C-alpha cells in the first residue's frame, strides 16, 4: 500500500468555556488536520494542534514541516517498509513534534487498515475501554468547586485540578473547597504546569498531605528543565510526582528514569513526535517499574482517538486524560472513540476508526 497523496487543512472549534492553566488560556481548539491517501483508496487521518508554550509549534510551522520536508520524502513510499518511513519522519528534521505526530497518526491509521484491525489491537490490544478524568481549569476556589461538582454529576470520578497560576495559599484553598464539595471518594490529581518553584512545591504538597486532602498525584510541579528540582520534590513528599513537560523524547525519559526524578510519566503524542516515540518511552518506563499516563493537548476527537488507541494497547499505561473533545462545542469527526460519562469505548473498525470530517467554515486546503 503506497502513499500517493498528503494533504492538510486547518480547523478551529470553539470551546464551551475557556480552558485555563498556569501556562495559557485557550478559547478555541485549533489544529492542522493531515490526510494521507493510499493507492488502495484508504485514507489515514492525523491531527496536530499548535501549542507554542509547550511544543513550540504553530499552525504555520506544522504545515511547513509537513509540506516542505515530510511530504516530499514520503510520497511513493510503501507501508510494507513502515520502519524506514518512521525513521525518516523522526530524523529528517529536529523538533516539530506535533507535525511528526500527525503524519505518524495517518500512517499508523493506514497500516492498521491494511492489516484489517483496529489500531489498538495492532499495538497490543490490552483493553478496549478506558476511564478518563476531567480537567478543572484554574479559576476562583468557588468556581472551580462548582465545576468539579458539575463534572461529578456527569459521571467523572477522577478530576484533574489545574494549579500553579497563583500563590500556594490560593492553590490549597482551591483544593480544600473542591474536596469539600465532591467528597472523599473522588480522586483528585493536580497539575501545576511548571508553576511552582521546588521549595513552593514541597511546602504546598506537604500542607495538603497534612490536611488529609487525599491527592492522587501532582503533575509537573516545577520547570521542565529543572530535573534536580523535580527530584527534590519527589524525594521530599509522599504524594506521587508525575513528569509531563520534562519528558518529550525517549532520551529525556531515560534521564528522568535513571535519576528517579519522578514516580510517573505523562506521555503525549504531541510531545513524543507520535506513536513510535511514545512506545519507546512507555517501554523504558515499564522496564523501570514506572507507570505511565497518556494525556493530550486541546485536540479534537481525531487526535484523542489516536492517543486512546495507543493507551488502550499497553498494560503499563494506567491513567488516561482524554477529556478534550468533551470541552468542544462541535464534534468535527465521524467515527472514532465514543464516550459514556467517563468511559471511553474503542472503535471496532480497522485503523483509527475515523470515517470522515465535517468541513468547518474557513477550512483551508493546502
Curated annotation (Swiss-Prot):
Pfam families: MR_MLE_C, MR_MLE_N. Mg(2+) binds at residues 191, 219, 244. Substrate binds at residues 24, 135, 160, 296, 298, 321, 323. Catalyzes the epimerization of L-Ala-D-Glu to L-Ala-L-Glu and has probably a role in the metabolism of the murein peptide, of which L-Ala-D-Glu is a component. Is also able to catalyze the reverse reaction and the epimerization of the other Ala-X dipeptides L-Ala-L-Asp, L-Ala-L-Leu, L-Ala-L-Met, and L-Ala-L-Ser. Is not able to epimerize other L-Ala-X dipeptides. Is also active with L-Ser-L-Glu and, oddly, L-Pro-L-Glu, but not with L-Glu-L-Glu, L-Lys-L-Glu, L-Lys-L-Ala, or D-Ala-D-Ala. It catalyses: L-alanyl-L-glutamate = L-alanyl-D-glutamate. It comes from Bacillus subtilis (strain 168). Induction: Repressed by AbrB, a transcription factor that negatively controls biofilm formation. Keywords: Cell wall biogenesis/degradation, Isomerase, Magnesium, Metal-binding. Belongs to the mandelate racemase/muconate lactonizing enzyme family. The gene is ykfB. Binds 1 Mg(2+) ion per subunit. SUPFAM superfamilies: Enolase C-terminal domain-like, Enolase N-terminal domain-like. The keyword Iron-sulfur does not apply. Homooctamer; tetramer of dimers. Gene3D superfamilies: Enolase-like C-terminal domain, Enolase-like, N-terminal domain. The active site is at 162 (proton acceptor), 268 (proton acceptor). GO terms for biological process: cell wall macromolecule catabolic process; cell wall organization; peptide metabolic process. Its cofactor is Mg(2+). The keyword Metal-binding applies. InterPro entries: Dipeptide_epimerase (IPR034603), Enolase-like_C_sf (IPR036849), Enolase-like_N (IPR029017), Enolase_C-like (IPR029065), Mandelate_racemase_C (IPR013342), Mandelate_racemase_N_dom (IPR013341). This is L-Ala-D/L-Glu epimerase. Its EC number is 5.1.1.20. Pathway: Cell wall degradation; peptidoglycan degradation. GO terms for molecular function: L-Ala-D/L-Glu epimerase activity; metal ion binding; racemase and epimerase activity. Disulfide bonds: none annotated.
